[in-house]
C-alpha cells in the first residue's frame, strides 16, 4: 500500500493529473474494447477483429474466474484510511485482483500491436496507451500493483496464445470451431459462478456481478457463433470503402449497437425483473445487429464518397491525348 499512498499524496497535490488519468483509464473499459472490435470488423480486417475480440473474451473469463476465486477486496476496503479518486469509484466494481481494465488495455492494444508489428507508429503508440492505462488504475487508487501486473501479464500470454489461430486465413470451419470453443468456455464459466458453493464470506454484490458478466459473455459469444456460421456464406461483406463511407459505417453502426445495448435494458427489466439471464439476450441481439444486420448496408454505404474519389483519381491521371503527346515528343 506504500506505493498507493505515495500516489495518493501526488493526486492530492495535483488533482489535474487525476482528471487526466480518469479519462485515460476509460481506454481499458468495455466501451472502448467494444468500439475497437467493431471498427476492426467493419472497416479494417475481419480476422484482426476476431483476433482482438477472442483475446478479450478469453481474458474476461480468466479475469472473472480469478477474481471470484481469490476475492481480494479493493484497496480502500482493505485499508479504510486510504482514499481514491471519487470519479473512478463507479467503474471500480467487483473484486480487485486482477485488474480487468489493465487486462483489457494490454489485450486490445497488445493484440493490435502484434498484428501490425511492421508498422512503426503502431509499435510506439499502442504500447504507450496500454502502459498509461496500467498506471491510471494505480494513480486513481482503484488497484494495487499486483492487480495491475497480473492482469497485464495474463493478457500478454493470451495475445501470443491466440495469435496462431488467426495468423493466416484458415477458413470458415476453423472459425466456427474456434468460436464454439469460446462458447463452451463461456458456458463453463457461467455454470461455475451459478453452481459453485462459494464461501459464506463471498460478497453477494460481487458474485451477482460475476454472474451478470457470465450471462453477457454467453450472449455475446452465441452471437459471434451465428456470425461465423452465416456471414462468410451469405453476406461476406467487404471492409474496404472510401474514407467518408468508413466514417458513416463506424458512427452509424456504433449508434445502432450502443443504442440497442442501452435501450434493451429497461425493456428486458420490465419483462423479467431483476433476473440476470436477460443480459445474454441483450448482448446476443447487439452482436447479431452489429455483425449480421448492419453489414447489409455496406454495399450502399460504400457508394458514399466513391464518386468524389473517382473524380480525384481521374483528375490526377493523364488523359489519353496527353499520353500520346508525350510519346510523340
Model-derived regions: residue spans:
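Residue-level signal for the membrane-embedded core of alpha-helical transmembrane segments
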Residues: 28-31, 53, 57, 103-107, ...
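Membrane-embedded catalytic cores of phosphoryl/pyrophosphoryl-handling enzymes
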Residues: 36-37, 42-43, 60, 76-265
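Short charge-dense sequence patches
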Residues: 4-7, 11-15, 56-63, 100-111
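Hydrophobic alpha-helical transmembrane segments of multi-pass membrane proteins
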Residues: 23-25, 53, 99, 149
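N-terminal transmembrane-helix/juxtamembrane module of multi-pass inner/ER membrane proteins
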Residues: 1-32, 63-94, 205, 215, ...
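Membrane helical hairpin/interfacial module
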Residues: 44-76
Amino acid at each position: 500500500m506504500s506505493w498507493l499512498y505515495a500516489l495518493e499524496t501526488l493526486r492530492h497535490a495535483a488533482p489535474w493529473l487525476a482528471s487526466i488519468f480518469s479519462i485515460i483509464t476509460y481506454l481499458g473499459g468495455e466501451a472502448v474494447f467494444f468500439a475497437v472490435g467493431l471498427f476492426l470488423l467493419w472497416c479494417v480486417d475481419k480476422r484482426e477483429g476476431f483476433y482482438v475480440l477472442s483475446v478479450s473474451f478469453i481474458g474476461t473469463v480468466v479475469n472473472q474466474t480469478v477474481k471470484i476465486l481469490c476475492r481480494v477486496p479493493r484497496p480502500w476496503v482493505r485499508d479504510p484510511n486510504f482514499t481514491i479518486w471519487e470519479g473512478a469509484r463507479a467503474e471500480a466494481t467487483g473484486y480487485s485482483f486482477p485488474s480487468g481494465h489493465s487486462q483489457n488495455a494490454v489485450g486490445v492494444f497488445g493484440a493490435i500491436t502484434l498484428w501490425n508489428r511492421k508498422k512503426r507508429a503502431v509499435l510506439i503508440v499502442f504500447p504507450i496507451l496500454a502502459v498509461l492505462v496500467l498506471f491510471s488504475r494505480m494513480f486513481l487508487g482503484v488497484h494495487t500493483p499486483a492487480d495491475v501486473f497480473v492482469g497485464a501479464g495474463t493478457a500478454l500470454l493470451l495475445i501470443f496464445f491466440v495469435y496462431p489461430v488467426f495468423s493466416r486465413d484458415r477458413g470458415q470451419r476453423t472459425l466456427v470451431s474456434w468460436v464454439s470453443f469460446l462458447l463452451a468456455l463461456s458456458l463453463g464459466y457461467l455454470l461455475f459462478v451459478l453452481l459453485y458453493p462459494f464461501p459464506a464470506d463471498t460478497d453477494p454484490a460481487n458474485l451477482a456481478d460475476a454472474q451478470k458478466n457470465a450471462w453477457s459473455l454467453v450472449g455475446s459469444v452465441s452471437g459471434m457463433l451465428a456470425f461465423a456460421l452465416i456471414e462468410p456464406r451469405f453476406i461476406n461483406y467487404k471492409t474496404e470503402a472510401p474514407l467518408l463511407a468508413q466514417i458513416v459505417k463506424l458512427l452509424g453502426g456504433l449508434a445502432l449497437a450502443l443504442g440497442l445495448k442501452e435501450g434493451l435494458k429497461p425493456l428486458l427489466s420490465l419483462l423479467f425483473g431483476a433476473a440476470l439471464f436477460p443480459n445474454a439476450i441483450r448482448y446476443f441481439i447487439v452482436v447479431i445487429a452489429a455483425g449480421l444486420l448492419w453489414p447489409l448496408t455496406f454495399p450502399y454505404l460504400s457508394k458514399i464518397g466513391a464518386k468524389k474519389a473517382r473524380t480525384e483519381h481521374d483528375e490526377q491521371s493523364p488523359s489519353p491525348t496527353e499520353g500520346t503527346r508525350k510519346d510523340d515528343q
